[in-house]
Amino acid sequence: MSSKEHTSEEPWQGFYGPNLGVAVELYEEYQKDPNAVDDELREAFEKWGPPPATAPERTQSTFTAASITDPDVIKKFVGAVKLADHIRAFGHLAADIQPILKEQRREDMFDLDRFGLTESDIRSVPVDLLCPYAPAHVKNGLDAINHLKEVYTKTIAFEFVHVTDEEERKWLNRMIESGLYLPNLSTEQRKSLLKRLTDVEGFEKFLHRTFVGQKRFSIEGLDTLVPMLDEVVREAVHEGTTNVMIGMAHRGRLNVLAHVLNKPYEMIFAEFLHSLNKDLFPSEGSIGINYGWTGDVKYHLGADRQIRDENTAEARLTLANNPSHLEFVSPIVEGYARAAQEDRTSPGAPEQDIMKAYSILIHGDAAFPGQGVVTETLNLSRLTGYQTGGSLHIIANNNIGFTTETFDSRSTLYSSDPAKGFEIPIVHVNADDPEACLAAVHLAFQYRKRFKKDFLIDLIGYRRFGHNEMDEPAVTQPGVYQIIRKHPTVRELYSKQLVKKGLIDEQTVKQLDDEVQDKLQSVYEETLRNRTDEHLPDTPPVEVVNGLPKLDTGVQSETLKAINNELLEWPESFSVNPKLEKILKRRLNVFDGDGKVDWALAETLAFATILHDGTPIRLTGQDSERGTFAHRHLVLHDSRTNDVHSPLQSFRHANASFAVHNSPLSEMAIVGFEYGYNVFAPETLVLWEAQFGDFANGAQVMFDQWVSAGRAKWGQKSGLVCLLPHGYEGQGPEHSSARLERFLVLAAENNWTIANCTSAAQYFHILRRQAAILNTDSVRPLIMMTPKSLLRNQKVASSVEELTTGRFKTVLEQPNLGESHEKVERIVLCSGKIAIDLQDRIEKEADKDWDWVHIVRVEQLYPFPKEPLQEIFARYPNVKEIVWSQEEPRNMGAWPFVQSKIRRAAPNGINVRYEGRTYRSSPAEGDPIIHKQEQERIVTETLTR
């Protein structure tokens, strides 16, 4: 065989001498008139182009040297090549990949008469023409076709014609058709595999028998998933991977926890007995299993373990915590992997080493095509800011979703079909063939190692019981479950196979099973002896209960000035857009005289000082490099060459990395990714910015299930910062509201901080405070309503002195107002942009007497600043009422959350009332004129006696 790689896309390699001459002559006829040759030849010429002037060098051919001048013979060759291509492309349709639904096979697809061929025709075709990577036993064309059928239509099948990269397709052809990907298991390895399957099955049987009727979401029918995970983890660690991350739903999770993560059986049994002995558990944050104070059901919990291979290589294996929201853990695990791959200890962009971490995502067959977050996550796989060098996707395919069958759950032939749009190679494998399953995993890992791309395995099995163990599946799928109940388990099938080969005897098989059951029974009895009937509710850690520490976050003026000057130095040859350069250079004057620091500069200075302190930063979002409102400009573009320059990545005094990326048009996957990144890199200030805050609800599942509650459920800390542009400016219901009320309704137990700042200095200080609490027990997410039109408003800009001293203030009092304490009758509380609108009115009507009113801005809405407000209230003895003023409708914004808190903070007998929009189903008006009228009304009524 030639040393050059060939595929069936190079069909002319089988022609030489006179035969090649005939092909050349026919091609010349085709060029003159395509209709002058037969349909098959025309199709061949269209697909493969002209024959070469000379045939490629050959080292093997079964073709005789006899001259061929008959075009019919060429037609036979073309037909044979077409057959070979069809086997490669459509062999999966005839493959034995369904353990239960055998009738789906289309075994007659490759009958020779369908292609106008006989065995004699094919036998004369050179092997190289049909299967250039065939093993030595393939002697002629017929052998080659039979070999291809053996390769592509048995218990493992392949789809990769949708992969456009020729090198990848050639590699896959070679690996598959040569058999290089197949495991060469020794007798001991086969026995070990049987032992593993016995562990998996025995565990499920024990749970089923011991904890009757309790939910466990059994793996039975997909038992081979566990040895597959064993194998891929082994290969990854052997290749130097130091972090392997797994994301999966509840199906089979307990088995994976027990056998892949090594979660002790006694812990799992204790969870079934509702008698957890927490004294046995590792402390929060250590490698092991963490529990929050409210906890979660056993089949949602994650775990960590340290693993070591035979070469003493060490790695961390992580199974991510996961709620019942199927597939949403996928981008979180990708964030884990990216965080583990990056070195953030040096200035500049983080340095990524993809071999440091490998992500494995286990999907459900109904959820993979059903949940949009799947394709959002797949879309990240090749993006600069999000790629992780290839993930392994495994669809745990039991051909059903609860009670919904495939014809009601997807519009595609396979549940894996959405992956084709991302050119991900797909392997379908019968879960009843454990050795084929290991082969699929090996191929997947080798592909990732070589091409640094995703790979998908469709593990096709069945579900032995109902969706959960209290469900009776025969009610809705009676026919299928008649078959399943008679179907032997994969352990039974594999043990019989080994017995038949003489590798093991039946007595040893039974002994393995007995040993597993004896061990489980012994552990269970020990668990019963140690059980406790105490069910005391846990409480949050004291660091959470006590709230955030009071930290001075000011930075010396000289330091800020030096940083500012350095960030405005660009490479000599770099040409910034002239208009932008003029705007940015104005920042040079900020530190001279009475200069003001606007919002964007305050952010940049905060970032620079945080980097100087040694804290890495990662900022992503749609248009975040420039900023939606053209205010940030953290990445500059050369107006002549389109080269880019990020001043913060060139900052000489940084002691950690800085990353900023424009994200794809996605909220769900991106918020999940950034949350995962921050969880795995807790020392990093990770910020996600919505294009407009209105679009943050595209990630509502992430906020509900992870960001707000992850620590309470799982002990999973996060310091993620979410920047949500918010404010009513006449832009309609889709560009006004970040749905502040939704974040406030989730606020409890000091789970996160919610702020709406009205000055650049406040933003500077809150960012620095957030960076200071990272990787401590006081850490929590920060949800920030950020400005839009106020970004350039001078009333929001701050003096340099405000950045150099003090700290973030939870409340701000309106300057030059409320100075006559005895005269104040009304205190107006507000938050965000409405405060600036009120200030504008007072300044516009400065000739009026405003001594009767005082305005207080609530900069931090949660935790609610009760004590600071009470101190303010106490200064005004003649106050008659406290008014909460807001832009948002009455059933939205902060009012539904703060009204009871204000009443509890207010002096006895003081009326607390509301000013703002009325109750609405839509957050804002679409007509800018009506918007303006409403804004004017709110301001007027708030400031009218």
UniProtKB/Swiss-Prot annotation:
Pfam families in the record: E1_dh (PF00676), OxoGdeHyase_C (PF16870), Transket_pyr (PF02779)
Cofactor(s) named in the record: thiamine diphosphate
Gene3D superfamilies linked: 3.40.50.12470, 3.40.50.970, Multifunctional 2-oxoglutarate metabolism enzyme, C-terminal domain
Keyword Cell membrane: no
InterPro entries: 2oxoglutarate_DH_E1, 2oxoglutarate_DH_E1_bac, DH_E1, KGD_C_sf, ODO-1/KGD_C, THDP-binding, Transketolase-like_Pyr-bd
Keyword Cell inner membrane: no
This protein's UniProt keywords: Glycolysis, Oxidoreductase, Thiamine pyrophosphate
EC number annotated for this UniProt entry: 1.2.4.2
A biological process from GO: glycolytic process
SUPFAM superfamilies cross-referenced by the UniProt entry: Thiamin diphosphate-binding fold (THDP-binding)
GO CC field: cytosol; oxoglutarate dehydrogenase complex
Similarity comment: Belongs to the alpha-ketoglutarate dehydrogenase family.
Subunit structure: Homodimer. Part of the 2-oxoglutarate dehydrogenase (OGDH) complex composed of E1 (2-oxoglutarate dehydrogenase), E2 (dihydrolipoamide succinyltransferase) and E3 (dihydrolipoamide dehydrogenase); the complex contains multiple copies of the three enzymatic components (E1, E2 and E3).
HAMAP family: SucA_OdhA
Function in brief: E1 component of the 2-oxoglutarate dehydrogenase (OGDH) complex which catalyzes the decarboxylation of 2-oxoglutarate, the first step in the conversion of 2-oxoglutarate to succinyl-CoA and CO(2).
Protein name: 2-oxoglutarate dehydrogenase E1 component
Gene assigned in the entry: odhA
